[in-house]
Structure formats: structure tokens, C-alpha cells
């Protein structure tokens, strides 16, 4: 009887040992797989979530001083280059024309308002050719070339991954264009990783994608 119980306990112990070994093996394999995936991702892609949706923008401006008239385009309306969108009535009546194809995204004036030459009537953006501006670390920029494919996810449409292509790589870091570049009078220099702007085209963005939205990009090396 005691011998049978001992045999039963030994079998249970062996079973627990086998189960423990199996679980340990699964954990080890999961760690190896995770490490391999991380290595593959880090060596084959450049990623950043420091990116925004952008589009070519142009202001429709008053060509002369006077009062605005015949301005009846709401935000969201499209215009073509050369379209007469309003008139300025001053010493003479002058047409206000759009300087590019685009969509009205912000109205700046109302009919009857007095404006000076150069006053912005409205802001337009080319919504048909939106793109991504991504800031890439200087340590990663050598791994990127024009023509590289890109996976783009926009925060405004997070369930969709858009196809993209690297179109342009900046010739200077963002800090180069700071109005007041930092100076260091103490003599102590702190090295900061710089960012280079990269322009990425987006193929067939949805209506949910709007200029200024945040985005994440994964660029194939």
C-alpha cells in the first residue's frame, strides 16, 4: 500500500517536473522570439512617432486696399489656381484670385471688411497631396534613402496603415533654423541628438486624415 502511494507520488513529481520544464522552455522560446523580432525590427526599419501630416499651404491675399466683397466661400470649399474668389473695392475694383489648387481651411475676413494690400483673405491647403513630415534622428538618417517604402499610421485614423514613400531628406537639422540658436558661455557642452526632417508621401489617405495630425512612421531600410 505504502509502496503504491510512493509510486504515485513519484509519478506526480515527474509530471510536475515535465510540466515545469515545458513551461520553462516555452518562456525561453518566447524570449528568444521576442529578441529576434526586436533585432529584426531595429535592423530593418527606422521608426518614429515624431511626425505630422502636412500639405502645401498658400494664402489668398488682398491685392490692394479697400473693402472685401463677393466673398462667399466657406471653409471646406475647393478652389482652382486663377479662380476669382472675391473682389476688393477701393479706388478701383480689383479681383482676388487663388494662387493654387486647394481647399479653404480658414477664413480670415468677412464681406464689407476693410483690408490693406497683402491682408490674408483665407488660407488654402492642397488636400489632394497630403504628406508626412517626420523628424529622424541624425544617427538613423544614413539608413534612409529617397524611395524607401514607409508604413504610416495617423492618430486620426489609427486602425488604418497607409503606404508611403520617402520623397525628400532634409539637408540640415531642424535646429539649424532656430531663430535663437542656443549658446554655451560656461564651456560645458551637452551633446543632443539632432533631428533631420524627412518628407513622406501618403498613398490614398482617408478623409479622416487632416493636416496637423500626429502620425507614426516605420521606414524600411
UniProtKB/Swiss-Prot annotation:
Primary location recorded for the protein, binned into one broad class: membrane
Keyword Transmembrane among record annotations: yes
Annotated transmembrane regions: 17-37
InterPro entries (UniProt xref): CusB-like_dom_1, MFP, Single_hybrid_motif
Gene Ontology CC, one term: plasma membrane
Pfam family, one: CusB_dom_1
Matches recorded under SUPFAM superfamilies: Single hybrid motif (SSF51230)
The keyword Membrane belongs to this UniProt entry's keyword annotation: yes
Membrane topology: Single-pass membrane protein
Annotated compartments: Cell membrane
Keywords carried by this UniProt record: Cell membrane, Membrane, Transmembrane, Transmembrane helix
Cleavable signal peptide: none
Homology family: Belongs to the membrane fusion protein (MFP) (TC 8.A.1) family.
Identification of the protein by name: Putative efflux system component YhbJ
Species for this entry: Bacillus subtilis (strain 168)
